[in-house]
Amino acid sequence: MRDYDTKALRSKIGVVSQKKALFAGTVRDNIRFGKQDATDEEIWQALETAQAKQMIEEKSGQLDFVLEQEGKNLSGGQRQRMTIARALVRKPEVLILDDAASALDYATGAALNKALRNTDFAPTVITVSQRVAAIRNADTIVVLDEGEIVGMGTNDELLRSCEVYKEIFDSQLEKEDA
């Protein structure tokens, strides 16, 4: 990694953080912040994968719909889908979602995960999350406790072998059932 060209490395990685950084301007301009020369077709494809296509199709002006600073005229989940689309328009080899889907409901999150697995560029997705629902279908889950790795495996494997994961899983399941 140390010998790898930083610019080349950054071109292969898309990062979406919990903070939803949207700018005053059109949907098109906000998505092109991820790839300046993105065509409308590429933008629509990124929006579709990010589960934001229908939302934008319903806005007057569609790609020319003007977002307020920080996307204040969108809901939290809509803002998250927009920032995910911005990262996807670059077709990164690695996509890091740092609690980036925390405002998505379970169905939208599941649809996003399915769409990411079926993209034509199939990125490696690294999801950082405190929500079991966001990661339970991941190929590999790494469980941290106070900065230490205490478990690694699939959801089913961790439920059998990692007490920390099982406690988190059970507590979140109880909240969903309540």
Q: Which functions belong to the PLM regions below?
A:
Residues 2, 53-82, 97-100, 104-107, ...:
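ABC-fold ATPase nucleotide-binding domain signature/coupling loops
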Residues 84, 128:
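Hydrophobic anchor residue at the start of the ABC signature
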Residues 20-38, 74, 135:
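Conserved catalytic motifs of ABC-family nucleotide-binding domains
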Residues 3, 10, 28-69, 114, ...:
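ABC ATPase nucleotide-binding domain helical subdomain, centered on the C-loop/LSGGQ "ABC signature"
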Residues 89-93, 122:
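A short, proline-enriched helix->beta-strand linker immediately N-terminal to the Walker B motif
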Residues 41, 49, 58, 114, ...:
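C-terminal portion of ABC ATPase nucleotide-binding domains
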Residues 82, 88-89:
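Hydrophobic/aromatic position at a conserved helix-loop-beta junction
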Residues 7, 13-17, 126:
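ABC nucleotide-binding domain signature
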